[in-house]
Amino acid sequence: MNAIIAVIADGFQEDLITCIKSIRAHTDTPIYIETSGKENKTLCEPLAEFANLTANWQKNKLGWGHSVNQLLGRINSKYVILMDPSTQFTGDAITPTIAKFAEGYKAVGWRGGLVNLADEWRSTEDKGDGEVDVLFSYFLAVDKGAALQAGGFNARAIYYRNADIEFSLRLKHAS
């Protein structure tokens, strides 16, 4: 299974610890944590006990899109599963996700939405199962090659929601 779980961490240490514990309770998939900014220097220290976990900290604060692009460039894996630290596993999420890639999908996620055309594409409406316009990075698995071919995430995007919308549309258009 050629996958890595990637977490962008910015504060919320308790959420991060709970997230990592929930992942480890259900899978030994490698985890890579990206964090930046002086205030986050010690954020990952309590996670030293976990096996197969790599944390990277940078002194200069990066936005969400820039952080994800660095991860995509740094991680050596066919599939990258982006996760928000507020997400918790309640079972094996990796195996069924990877199975979807075998069906030809370039991205798979837990939550997605449809672009709201009525307000000139300024928002999305949540949708249940099925094809969506936008996947959200609470749990967003991507084929790394397809993600890079689509241009990755907007490096200027500070917040995940904005980056997710733009990236999802670019990936959908490129596929």
Predicted regions and their residues:
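Donor nucleotide-sugar recognition loop
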Residues: 134-139, 148-173
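A recurrent flexible, glycine/aromatic-enriched loop bordering the glycosyltransferase active site
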Residues: 123-145
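Short beta-strand/loop segment that forms part of the nucleotide-sugar
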Residues: 28-38, 56-58
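Glycine-rich, basic loop-to-helix element that forms the pyrophosphate-binding segment
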Residues: 58-75
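Short aromatic/hydrophobic "clamp" motif used to bind/position activated sugar donors
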Residues: 80
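Short, acidic, metal-binding catalytic loop of nucleotide-sugar glycosyltransferases
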Residues: 21-29
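N-proximal low-complexity "stem/linker" segments adjacent to membrane-targeting elements
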Residues: 1-22
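Conserved donor NDP-sugar-binding/catalytic core segment of glycosyltransferases
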Residues: 88-122
